[in-house]
């Protein structure tokens, strides 16, 4: 395992995609690249949408993970806020984002892509047929591995 930032990366899918970007954006001094597949990247926006809140079968606890969900926007858990801090500090990881057209997080991922493109982020964005499933992730992990080693 390298201690060289340029050879240290993180990747994940679904909530792990959020976790990968969270690690990368929280510690850009350690991680040079962070990749997400089907990531729950805009947690403040997802909380505000009825998609996740109203699902009675959802085992996810916003409060246990992030504290008061009403205070997510702009917090240390908000990837947009972390990105802006990294830009101000002059150290930002390269980002990779992949999502399937049929993924329930597709629209949220489009929003994240659009916001980061406005900020001129070093972002590779991929979308393709597929959903929030292993078939999609298995395809894109190959692409991510190639990207990480560039």
Predicted segments, located by residue:
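Non-catalytic cap/lid and distal C-terminal segments of serine-dependent acyl enzymes
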Residues: 1-150
């Amino acid at each position: 395992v390298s201690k060289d930032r340029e050879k240290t990366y993180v990747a994940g899918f679904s909530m792990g995609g959020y976790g990968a970007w969270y690690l990368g954006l929280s510690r850009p001094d350690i991680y040079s690249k962070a990749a997400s597949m089907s990531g729950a990247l805009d947690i403040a926006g997802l909380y505000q949408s009825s998609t996740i809140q109203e699902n009675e079968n959802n085992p996810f606890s916003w409060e246990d993970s992030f504290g008061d969900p009403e205070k997510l926007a702009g917090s240390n858990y908000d990837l947009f806020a972390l990105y802006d801090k990294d830009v101000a500090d002059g150290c930002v990881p390269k980002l990779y984002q992949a999502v399937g057209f049929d993924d329930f997080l597709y629209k949220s991922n489009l929003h994240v892509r659009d916001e980061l493109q406005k900020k001129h982020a070093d972002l590779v964005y991929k979308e393709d047929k597929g959903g929030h499933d292993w078939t999609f992730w298995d395809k894109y992990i190959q692409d991510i591995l190639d990207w990480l080693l560039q």
